[in-house]
Amino acid sequence: MRSHYCGDINRSHLGQEVTLVGWVNRSRDLGGVVFLDLRDREGLVQVVYDPDLKDVFDVASSLRGEFCVQVTGLVRARPDSQINSQMKTGEIEVLGKGLTIINASAPLPLSMDNHQNNSEEQRLKYRYLDLRRPEMAERLIFRAKVTSAVRRFLDSNGFLDIETPILTKATPEGARDYLVPSRTYKGQFFALPQSPQLFKQLLMMSGFDRYYQIVKCFRDEDLRADRQPEFTQIDIETSFMTSEEVMVKTEEMMRGLFLELLNVDLGEFPRMTYNEAMRRFGSDKPDLRNPLELVDVADLLKEVEFAVFNGPANDEEGRVAALRIPNGATLSRKQIDDYTKFVGIYGAKGLAWMKINDLAAGMEGIQSPVLKFLTESIVNDIISRTGAQTGDIILFGADKANVVAEAMGALRLKAGEDFELLEGQWRPLWVIDFPMFEKINGGFHAVHHPFTAPRGVTAAELEANPANRVSDAYDMVLNGCELGGGSVRIHNAEMQSAVFRILGIEEEEAKEKFGFLLEALRYGTPPHAGLAFGLDRIIMLMTGATSIRDVMAFPKTTTAACPLTNAPGFANPAQLTELGIKVVEKVKVADGE
């Protein structure tokens, strides 16, 4: 039906007759000549119809936006005065000779020109129209190029694309599972995989030493801008490779991806330990484009007669951190109050501050509501340690260390944007040496997942002191976003059982949930390591989209619904009976009953 894509026509086709198909992006009648902008996935081309061909001209005059048409015509150069440098095809146009309406379009339920006027609900309900927009089409085409490049790289490096099951068993990976009832085994359920983690480890035990898969994963969790109930991972696992070798190989893949598709050389990725990242940036995925850093000042404030400072300063689990903002002394009291409310979102009880109005004037040049509690020596030490200059402001967070890190880390990001301090476009790094466990409500939880290996300890040593053990794990971070995370896996049953015990998973529960894994670990399991990248997030960053919904063909809403298909929906009662499922209606209790 066509000889070329609309967006591919250029000066090399001058004088050629072409056949194009696509949608009418815009139609206008200027002085008895009809101009059509015809659109397909590759872009736009201008088609001109003269009144000399009356029948064809009449059809062209009747066209409206989003009519699906076939055009035949002659490629010619545009007059110099009409060249459009904003269009890929802006140097040429097609003189229309033939025109067939393949399908007319009803009046559109959303705007194609001003998509900002369309609600998110409208865009998802009429996604097939929203995806016709060049911006959306370009993102999906770019996504296809990324997956193609990833496959080429992994294939050429000896990795095998192997599928793993979608109907599987529930495992504790940090989010709720999507459950699928079994008709054959009434009362029992499959779970959709949150990741192929255990199956890819089993593949390593099977001798397939380099595996990959671009795979759908499912998590029933509360959604944010960068989360969806179903998402896509670039899943990788290797045998007989160290964490260093995995990082080198996957960094090579990511650098190649950016160079090939964006012509960006990311350079060598620096390494940073988890502890350093939390200390300097209050985050395990720091945005290194932001030059602001947190500075510990607790040792300077242990003796001050101000409980807000000396309490956390003398608490083993406390922290007092300072954040210097260059030229921040211009902040008004209202702006500082807004920052105080902002850190309150993250659990901080307040925000102390100190303006350096005139460094040369000593204490007279300092403005702060807490200045009366501080000696000149302490103030000078704080200024020296933070590197503050005249015109700067220093903001203080004082609380439990985890609260300070989260609140001041978030404030660091906000201040960096507010003061337009971000430097450079791309700043990648590896974060390494994560804690094995974190304590929540008195119990230990795996920082990554229960199959992550500790670094350099035996099972007995791990159980003797789990709180201070480091995992052999690594995260790839870019501009404050985690692109992917991985680790060396546990490859012997003794260590795996020890980790389960630390996590409070009793032997019977471990056998019921992971008996197949513990059994497999008994039969010559090789050392193995891997990593999984979030494909949707990578595409979002590379295309500059603000949400992963804008780089997925058919995403869900923030309430995990699909306006296009009205999913989820109610099941047929006969199906429920066959599955042995009865839906229990929520009973609303009246006030006072």
Curated annotation (Swiss-Prot):
This is Aspartate--tRNA ligase. Gene3D superfamilies: Bira Bifunctional Protein, Domain 2, GAD-like domain, Nucleic acid-binding proteins. L-aspartate binds at E173, R219, H448, R489. Homodimer. PANTHER family: ASPARTATE--TRNA LIGASE, MITOCHONDRIAL, ASPARTYL/LYSYL-TRNA SYNTHETASE. GO terms for molecular function: aspartate-tRNA ligase activity; ATP binding; nucleic acid binding. GO terms for cellular component: cytoplasm. Belongs to the class-II aminoacyl-tRNA synthetase family. Type 1 subfamily. The keyword Cell membrane does not apply. Its EC number is 6.1.1.12. ATP binds at R219, D220, E221, Q228, E482, G534, L535, D536, R537. It catalyses: tRNA(Asp) + L-aspartate + ATP = L-aspartyl-tRNA(Asp) + AMP + diphosphate. Keywords: Aminoacyl-tRNA synthetase, ATP-binding, Cytoplasm, Ligase, Nucleotide-binding, Protein biosynthesis. One of its GO terms (biological process) is aspartyl-tRNA aminoacylation. It is found in: Cytoplasm. Residues 197-200 are annotated as: Aspartate. Pfam families: GAD, tRNA-synt_2, tRNA_anti-codon. Catalyzes the attachment of L-aspartate to tRNA(Asp) in a two-step reaction: L-aspartate is first activated by ATP to form Asp-AMP and then transferred to the acceptor end of tRNA(Asp).
